[in-house]
């Protein structure tokens, strides 16, 4: 089921998101966060986390958090490798 969800998210990123414009108030974007959450936590928990994130990504949410590192921090704590994009 995770593979299907990831394919749907990728479809959204490549075909639907460009039509809507860059409206996400978070970094990483909600769709990227959903991909990371599903990969780390599995289908159900990852979808739940993505749903909670998407609810916050609208103009009426009373919050100013723009940068969210929760998923990436979890990857470091759990021992999963995190790609370092800085030159050595």
From Swiss-Prot:
Check the record and name the SMART domains matching this protein: Haemolytic
Q: Name one GO cellular component term.
A: plasma membrane
User: Which top-level group of life is the source organism from?
Assistant: Bacteria
User: Where does the UniProt annotation locate this protein?
Assistant: Cell inner membrane
Q: Does the keyword Hydrolase apply?
A: no
**Membrane topology listed for this record:** Peripheral membrane protein
Q: Which Pfam families match?
A: YidD
What are the disulphide bonds in this sequence? none
Q: Keywords in alphabetical order, please.
A: Cell inner membrane, Cell membrane, Membrane
Q: Does the keyword Cell inner membrane apply?
A: yes
Q: What does this protein do?
A: Could be involved in insertion of integral membrane proteins into the membrane.
Q: Which NCBIfam families match?
A: membrane protein insertion efficiency factor YidD (TIGR00278)
PANTHER family in the cross-refs: MEMBRANE PROTEIN INSERTION EFFICIENCY FACTOR-RELATED (PTHR33383:SF1)
Name the family the entry cites: Belongs to the UPF0161 family.
* Designated name of the protein: Putative membrane protein insertion efficiency factor
* The species this protein was found in: Rickettsia canadensis (strain McKiel)
């Amino acid at each position: 089921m995770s593979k299907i969800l990831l394919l749907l998210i990728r479809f959204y990123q490549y075909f639907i998101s460009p039509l809507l414009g860059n409206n996400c108030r978070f970094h990483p974007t909600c769709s990227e966060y959903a991909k990371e959450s599903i990969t780390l936590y599995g289908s159900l928990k990852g979808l739940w986390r993505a749903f909670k994130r998407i609810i916050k990504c609208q103009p009426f949410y009373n919050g100013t958090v723009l940068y969210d590192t929760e998923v990436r921090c979890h990857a470091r704590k759990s021992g999963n490798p995190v790609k370092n994009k800085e030159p050595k």
